[in-house]
Regions:
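Basic, polar low-complexity surface loops/patches
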Residues: 1-162
Length: 162
């Protein structure tokens, strides 16, 4: 059986964010009550299209074969329940991956998927972390403005120890 639109959508989104953030990018796509990851296996046995193999080792997930093909290659799948997302994000980030999360929303009789969050090792603060956190808060303000017909960049910065 040849591919359905969900797999094409997955690989198109993966390609977009991999081009933007690099090869260590993984898409977590909500399908029903699961976040799913897909990959493809060609006739030579090579897995491509995403980092599904590496991610499954990191997250201790099983890879299963779908009975559909995309461009003639076998579709592979892994996933976890939606309520477990916060448990897997730190594992993905610890393996130096960027996690792009697309959620599913009802739209008429069907569903649409839209970007919910992009987690990267430098931007994620784990709420379960036991690492001490300071009481500092920082605000950065950046604005482009014209001064006498010339573009200027104005930057404001404040740090407060609360």
């Amino acid at each position: 059986m040849e591919t359905t639109s969900i797999f094409k959508e997955y690989f198109d989104i993966t390609k977009k964010y991999t081009a933007q953030y690099g090869n260590n990018t993984i898409l977590l796509l909500q399908v029903g009550s699961f976040f799913e990851i897909y990959g493809m296996r060609n006739k030579a046995g090579e897995i491509y299209g995403s980092s599904i193999s590496d991610l499954c080792q990191v997250c201790q997930l099983n890879v299963s074969e779908k009975k559909v093909h995309h461009n003639g290659d076998q579709i592979l799948m892994a996933g976890f329940r939606d309520y477990a997302l916060e448990r897997y994000i730190p594992r993905i980030l610890d393996a130096n991956y960027i996690a792009v999360v697309y959620v599913q929303e009802k739209s008429g009789k069907g569903f649409i998927r839209k970007l919910d969050a992009i987690y990267s090792p430098g931007t994620y603060l784990n709420p379960e972390s036991t690492t001490s956190v300071s009481n500092n808060i920082m605000c950065i303000w950046i604005d482009k403005t014209k001064v006498r017909k010339q573009q200027k960049l104005v930057i404001g910065l404040s740090v407060v120890n609360i």
